[in-house]
């Protein structure tokens, strides 16, 4: 399967195929000239896939370096980015060279941020190995690092030269790491793909059902992401639909401490909380929040956040990128499979944090 992303100033393809990681070197050689490559990965993924990718690339004639950092959301910082800049400079990486992001969402966001800012931008590729990265963060060109104030507070828009997705890599994830990716998959069904939602309804929620249906849910998710990115590359209109559940979700991630609540888990809680309040305000049809709750519960996603503190959460989300002056934009669902953006006074977000 292949998904084409044809933007006005840059086009690339997303290759989705079981077992395609074993052909990654050949894939890269068709996209890039023989040059220097730095693979950016984390301590977990390096053990699983680092040596294989290095050998494949060297076989194709590339000069290869590897930068690995401690796995986890806590590494997605400007401090780690600065260490990578130093590594690239030490190895004399130039604008004719390239970076490959090999790993999950943290690796992809951080590596893409570095690629987009080092020497004002060098080429990069994404090889995502987690479900969250395969369906969401590796696609669309958003890069970023976290700060103590907010998630992804510092970032850029930069498109990769290609994305290689091998669903087989999901088999090496722990159960929690696999399940958290379903938070984003469920979101896609809710905002713009009723067929995907029906696929999820037919699944029994087990780990085996996720792995057995991985190719289909990844493909559907990539198609939804592609549609929104093509229509709104810089997140000013339609693409904002992809933020459903993320305003509250990101606040939960910051409040809990990066990595304590995984991204997809926080999004699941955020979607449920926002939908319940939106229903009470008659902005969404009754029953959708229960549908979301039931779906998240079926797949083993958390549906509550035990450390809920509405005042602290409000202070955190006041730094959200969707805030503008004294207003903030939220995403609501007129019906299953459809989304719209609704602007409210920032102060009204306190209502959406009421349990």
UniProtKB/Swiss-Prot annotation:
One GO-annotated biological process of the protein: amino acid biosynthetic process
Residues the record lists as binding NAD(+): 105-109, 129-130, 142, 151, 169-172
Reactions this protein catalyses: 7-phospho-2-dehydro-3-deoxy-D-arabino-heptonate = 3-dehydroquinate + phosphate
GO CC entries: cytoplasm
Superkingdom of origin organism: Bacteria
Cofactor section: Co(2+); Zn(2+); NAD(+)
Protein function: Catalyzes the conversion of 3-deoxy-D-arabino-heptulosonate 7-phosphate (DAHP) to dehydroquinate (DHQ).
UniProt name for this protein: 3-dehydroquinate synthase
Gene name of the record: aroB
């Amino acid at each position: 399967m292949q998904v084409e992303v044809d933007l006005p100033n840059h086009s690339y393809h997303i290759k989705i195929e079981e077992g395609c990681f074993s052909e990654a070197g050949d894939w890269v050689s068709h996209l890039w000239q023989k040059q220097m490559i730095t693979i950016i990965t984390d301590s977990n993924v390096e053990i699983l896939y680092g040596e294989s990718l290095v050998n494949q690339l060297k076989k194709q004639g590339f000069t290869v370096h590897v930068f690995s950092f401690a796995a986890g959301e806590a590494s997605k910082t400007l401090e780690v980015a600065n260490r990578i800049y130093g590594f690239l400079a030490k190895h004399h990486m130039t604008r004719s060279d390239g970076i490959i992001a090999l790993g999950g969402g943290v690796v992809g966001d951080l590596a893409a941020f570095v690629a987009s800012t080092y020497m004002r931008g060098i080429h990069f590729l994404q090889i995502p190995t987690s479900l969250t990265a395969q369906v969401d963060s590796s696609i669309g060109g958003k890069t970023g690092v976290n700060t103590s104030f907010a998630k992804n507070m510092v970032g850029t828009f930069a498109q990769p030269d290609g994305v290689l997705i091998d669903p087989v890599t999901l088999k090496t994830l722990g159960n929690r790491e696999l399940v958290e990716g379903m938070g984003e998959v469920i979101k896609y069904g809710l905002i713009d793909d009723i067929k995907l939602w029906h696929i999820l309804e037919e699944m029994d929620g087990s780990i085996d059902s996720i792995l057995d249906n991985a190719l289909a849910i990844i493909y559907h998710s990539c198609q939804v992401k592609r549609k929104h990115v093509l229509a709104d590359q810089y997140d000013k209109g339609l693409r904002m639909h992809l933020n459903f559940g993320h305003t509250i979700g990101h606040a939960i991630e910051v409040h809990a401490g990066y990595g304590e609540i995984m991204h997809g888990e926080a999004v699941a809680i955020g979607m449920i909380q926002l939908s319940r309040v939106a229903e009470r305000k008659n902005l969404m049809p009754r029953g959708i929040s229960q549908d979301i709750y039931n779906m998240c519960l079926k797949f083993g996603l958390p549906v509550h956040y035990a450390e809920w503190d509405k005042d602290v959460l409000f202070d955190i989300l006041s730094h959200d990128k969707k805030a503008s002056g004294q207003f903030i934009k939220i995403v609501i669902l007129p019906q299953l499979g459809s989304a719209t953006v609704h602007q409210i006074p920032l102060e009204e977000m306190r209502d959406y944090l009421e349990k």
